[in-house]
Amino acid sequence: MAVLGLQGVRGGVGTTTITAALAWSLQMLGENVLVVDACPDNLLRLSFNVDFTHRQGWARAMLDGQDWRDAGLRYTSQLDLLPFGQLSIEEQENPQHWQTRLSDICSGLQQLKASGRYQWILIDLPRDASQITHQLLSLCDHSLAIVNVDANCHIRLHQQALPDGAHILINDFRIGSQVQDDIYQLWLQSQRRLLPMLIHRDEAMAECLAAKQPVGEYRSDALAAEEILTLANWCLLNYSGLKTPVGSAS
C-alpha cells in the first residue's frame, strides 16, 4: 500500500491530468485506487465526469462542519475520487482564514491507509507552501515532481527544494524542439532522480479534459496513455509502500 503525492514544480505543467491518468492506469492493472484532490482549484473532479456544478468535496465538508468521508465518489469498482470542493470567492481570496481547519484530513487518510481498503492513494498537490500541503507531503510514502522541459522548470530545479526522495517526471516533451532536447540532455547528466520514462506531447492529453475522462479511458491507444501505463507499471515495481530513502538513486 502506498500514498503517492504528485506536485508540479510550478503551475501549468499538467500535474492534475497526469494524476487522473495514473489513477486510471493503476486501476486498469487491478489495483484499488483512491485519488484525492488537494488543490483549492478543485479541477481534478472534471477528469472523472463530475458535473461542473458539483460543489461537494472533503475540504468543503470540513469547512461546513460535515463528515469529509461523505464527499467521496465512486468512478469504477476499483477507483474512487475525493474532490477538494468548491470555495467561495471570499475563501479563495483569504486562504489563511481556513487552511488550518483542514489538518484532520491527514489523520483520516492515515486511517484509510491502515485499513487496507486501497492499494494506492494518489494526492494531487498544489504548488504552494501552505501548512496543509506540507502535512500532506509528509504523509506521502513517495512523490513525483512534474516538470516541463523548459528554462522555467530548469531554473526552479536549481532554486527550489523538491520533496525528500522525489522522482522527477517529464511531461509534454516535444520531439523536434532544439531547446527541449538541449535541456533534456543536460538533465540526463545532472538530475539523478529523473524517471526513466517521460510523457510526450499528445493532443489526447488536451482533449481528455474536454471529454471529462482520464486519457487512458478517453483514448487508450494514444501515445501518452501508453506512457502513463508504463509509469503505472514502474510505480508497481518501485513503490512498495515504504518511504523512499533520502538520497537514493533508485
From Swiss-Prot:
ATP binds at V9, R10, G11, G12, V13, G14, T15, T16. GO terms for cellular component: cytoplasm. This is Cellulose biosynthesis protein BcsQ. It comes from Escherichia coli (strain K12). Pfam families: CBP_BcsQ. It is found in: Cytoplasm. SUPFAM superfamilies: P-loop containing nucleoside triphosphate hydrolases (SSF52540). InterPro entries: Cellulose_synthase_operon_BcsQ (IPR017746), P-loop_NTPase (IPR027417), ParA/MinD_ATPase (IPR050625). Coiled coil: none annotated. Induction: Part of the yhjR-bcsQABZC operon. Expressed at low levels in mid-log phase, expression increases as cells enter stationary phase, the increase in stationary phase is dependent on rpoS. In K12 strains the premature stop codon in position 8 has polar effects on downstream genes, decreasing their expression about 10-fold. Belongs to the BcsQ family. Essential for cellulose biosynthesis, shown for strain 1094, a commensal, natural cellulose producer. Also shown in strain W3110 which has a restored reading frame (TAG stop codon to TTG for amino acid 6, called strain AR3110), this protein. May play a role in subcellular localization of an active cellulose biosynthesis apparatus at the bacterial cell pole. The combination of cellulose and the curli fiber network confer cohesion, elasticity and tissue-like properties to colonies. NCBIfam families: cellulose_yhjQ, PRK10037.1. Keywords: ATP-binding, Cytoplasm, Nucleotide-binding. It comes from the Bacteria. GO terms for molecular function: ATP binding. Disruption phenotype: Deletion abolishes cellulose production.
